Amino acid sequence: MHLFKRIALTLWLIISSTLAVVITEDRVDRGTISVNLGEVTVNSGASWSIINNAVTAFAGKINVQSGGGLYISSTSPLLALQVTLTSLLDSITNDGVISLDSRASLTASNYNLIGLSFTNNGEMYLAASGVLPSTMDLTAASWTNNGLIVAYQNQRSSGVLNLGTPLGAITNNGQICLYNQVYQQQTRIEGSGCITANKNSAIYISNAVLPVATTQNFYLQDSKSSMIVQAVSSTQTFNVYGFGNGNKIGITLPAVGIPPNPAYSYDVDTGILTVRAGLLSQKFNIGLGYYSLFFSVVTDNGAGLPSTILGSISYSGPVPSRNLPASCKIACKPVPTAPGTNPTEYTTTITTTNSAGNPLTETGVVDISTDSNGSWFTTTSIFPTTSQSSSSETVASSSQPDSSSTEPSAFPSSTGDSSAEPSITSDYSSSELSVVPSSASESASESSAEPSSASESASESGSESVASETSASESASEQSSTSESVSSEFASSDSSSEPSSASESSVESSSASEFVVPSSATETSVSESASESSAEPSSASESVASESAVSETSASESAAPSSASETSVSESAASSSASESFASESSVESSAVPSSASEFSTSESVASETPASETPASETPASESASEQSSTSESSAEISSASESSAEPSSAKSAISESASEFSAAPSSASQSSASQSSTNESSSQQSSAESSSTGTSSVSASAATSEYTATWTTTNSDGSVSTESGIISQSGSSFTTITTFVPDATSEYTTTWTTTNSDGSVSTESGIVSQSGSSFTTITTFAPDATSEYTTTWTTTNSDGSVSTESGVVSQSGTSLTTITTFAPDVTSEYTTTWTTTNSDGSVSTESGIVSQSGSSFTTITTFEPPVVCKRDDVNCGSSIGLSTPYYGNSSQPLSSTKMTDTSATQTVDSSLSSITDATTTQSVNSLETPVPTSGSGNGSNNGSDNGSNNGSNNGSNNGSGSGNGSNNGSNNGSGSGNGFNNGSDNGSNNGSGNASNNGSASGSGSDNGSDNGSDNGSDNGSNNGSNTDNGSNSGSDSGNGIDNGSGNGSSDGSDNGTTNGSGSGGESNNGSGNGSDNGSSPDNGSNNGSNNGSNNGSGDGIGTGSNSDTDNGSGNGSNNGSGSVNGSANGSGNGSNNGSNSGSNSDNGSNNSSGNGSSSDLGSVSGTGNGSNEGSSNESGANNGSNNGAGALPAATLSVVPSPSADSGSTSSASAMVIPNTNGSGKLLNGKVLTLSVLSSMVVVFL
């Protein structure tokens, strides 16, 4: 079994190697071929072009070496390409060019290459028409691209490009370009390459679960390209370049946001665009410089994509400037033209043996072209050589001449004159060969090629010519009946054979289509049609007429002496009837000699008839004697040397354009046939030509065994190279002698630029390298157009006044050429006040404010405000240097409704929280407040509340009130009433004494509700800060959170723990107050404990603290003993302080401050009762008022922003902000705040209380 396998494997290797195809030189195959066996290798420098092969199935490895090319193409609209490789064991390696091109087809194409591995280091092109969806699959387990891959369609369809094995991986380090195509990702993508979408292409990431390397790049190169990514839970970030100008980025679900996340968002710091579909999202790194104003949600409904309504984001602005990665800079090239897909033609030479056993060499043109359906056919036209004995054949090749003003003449000259260069073979596409015998009396050969417009007009002007008797013709009549005229017709395309204007104008005066050779007949009618040329052989000595544009020819000038062997007939177009005309105008011979090796067409010998009156027969005896030689001579095809060409055309405007369109030759028995062309208007040139003809022309005498013809041959040079040469050879039997070798056209290559008119009528400019050989131009290389990119940039412009302005816009760059597409309108500059943070050198962060100017995305700081002056509580001199006066008291816990400040010059409205003042002038003097500021308890709370917690109240109550039960009620109610400074004593007062309630209520407003808020502020500062020094009360309020957070969490434990846990928590006022109230006074036990602790330490007398078991006893005991005098107050204070907290009892001043804070100010006495401190227990009213103010919370601070209006002198807007800081004077006296002056210094306002 193993032996069998080895044998089978060996046989397979032998068969594979045997069937392997190795391309070592350029090869073109058209039509059906089979390549389904063996390995295909294209060597470097070679190419294989397969054209119109419907199915190309590879069954082995494909290896294209560097510099090699494999081209498979279709030129038929009915034929689609099917290119497959279905071997799972073979590979594709491309280091050169692989091109699969069926753009001409109207049917669907199928490119399905499946192998073990795919490696592309060169260029690979997959092209289709897109009329129907096509398949483009490059599938391999190992897939690597380091070069260029182009997927192209003429128009977009639902067909897609698939790369790699599904769920596998591809490595792209090169460039993948899309034209009207969709790339559908089904694999992991690795590498640092680029995928570029051009001309309405799309990139579809259909399986976003498979990772895409963060080094892979996606480039949207035009405004119609897009990118779609599957919306899945695994979010990736894709590098996208070129996003803008209306192209799209999206996901496969509608873009919908879930608050707080919007449907899409752009991070200006990272340049990442996030597109969301609910909880699913994908991110795209589009770069910096985008403005949110230009983003919009759109629908991408392109062919080949899942149509998701409102699933994409478009950016209508230009693409911000961003450097492309190197892989995206690899140029996307157009699909190359396969060799052999353009119609072509070439000349070939065939050597055969004739019936006589002699070799016969034939030359012809091979034309390869297509029909209307794109199918190829080949036409070969053979030109017979002139092998005669006594008879002669003339091959008349008719084709329209090349449209060049430098059309070569029929006679190459050794001088290298451009007018004497041979023409080229591109004038022929097909041929018909016809032989028409001619008789002596008529000219019967016809040419199918129509002459140029100039020739037509010339034939019309000379449409009738009658040749009268000539002695030369009479004597030559013996041989005329044996001649034949062979006309070979070549139909060529109009584009390649139209004569140029220079050639047309040069033959207008000649009878371009008429060639009249005097025959043995007395009269010869001349062809009237431009499409006919008479090639009538005669026995005259080489009656080959020279064509001349000479308008006048005198007989004496044209009758210069010439020998019998040099006689030529000169006919001028100036006459419609010709008599004996033997004037020799030129020694240049005209014969049926092709003007080059690749073209069988000769100079048209147009007989311009000379007026009879100017050319008398008596002056032409030479031609008569020449008839004696007519029986032995043949039409020879001699090319004159430089000395023989004295009558060469003097300019490119000679009648040479007719030499390619019509050929008429009159083989004669003379030993020489010559034709001269001249564009001169005087006969002096004819004289000089006649002189040279008598000395410089060598005649060839033909014999029955000798023939001359033009042929092409190859020569191996000394270096081994093969070159092709053409010339005239003489054959005598089996002997060949080269008479003349044509000078090859000088070939030059150079770079040039030309314009091309496209099918839509637009004109495009192309550049490349062309090769010029004579008047033939061949395009060798067409430069790929410069890649055009558009980007946003900024430039400077010098204005007419010499100033320099900066502008921005979108420019288009093609190579080194820059074109401005859009110039952005300059950004509107605005100035406003703002606040920002600055990181100092030590790492700390400071906040600054000022005026900034914004122009687009550029910010400029105009003014930086100096930081505010902060005044401490008792610094009465603070602010005096800046002219501050009496402050305003604000309260954020109890907002003032519609509070207005009135200026002397304007009215400003302050919002309810007193947070800002608008349209203020630089200095504000506020005269009045429409809503007065309450003074009950305000200000007092900051000092009083700190010492005056739940214990403080119980002591105060027991000492303050004269009635029984005062203490017990005071304790229970004191706890629930907590927090709000100026409403604090409402419940306290009502239960504090028999007379207290009525006064207390009227002074304080509401009852229990006030107490609930009171606790949080009241007790917060009481614990931690209470009792350490005289400043304890005031600091208690200010240190505990600026009033708002003052005492948070303190109230709840205020009654029971009374100071030890006081101020430990944090929280809002309402929660603290409510908790404080419920714990502090909700039960008799709470009150009794409160009383007992207070009582036991409160006084120095006997039984002061014994009433600890019940509220009533405790209160009554406290009341009777405590309320006797001022000593009681001081004892109360000291006792109060000691129980008020672990930190509060160290100083007896704590109690005294508590007393003084409760009513020592005369200002406060006017509202709440005078003499409150020293006469604390003597008056019920005084006690009641004391209760109402007792425990006032700390006044919260408020922030006041001031924005002055533009001043008349500066024209700018400044702004300021200030901190309203609570304050009392050193003696605890509350400042009166009815008038506020806001002074602005360095754009900053400072206000203190």
From Swiss-Prot:
Keywords: Cell wall, Glycoprotein, GPI-anchor, Lipoprotein, Membrane, Secreted, Signal, Virulence. Residues 383-415, 429-716, 941-959, 983-1043, 1079-1097, 1139-1167, 1175-1194, 1205-1217 have a biased composition (Low complexity). Residues 960-982, 1062-1078 have a biased composition (Gly residues). A lipid is attached at N1225 (GPI-anchor amidated asparagine). Pfam families: Hyphal_reg_CWP, Hyr1. Residues 1-20 form the signal peptide. It is found in: Secreted, Cell wall; Membrane. Belongs to the HYR1/IFF family. GPI-anchored cell wall protein involved in cell wall organization, hyphal growth, as well as in host-fungal interaction and virulence. This is Hyphally regulated cell wall protein 3. It comes from Candida albicans (strain SC5314 / ATCC MYA-2876) (Yeast).
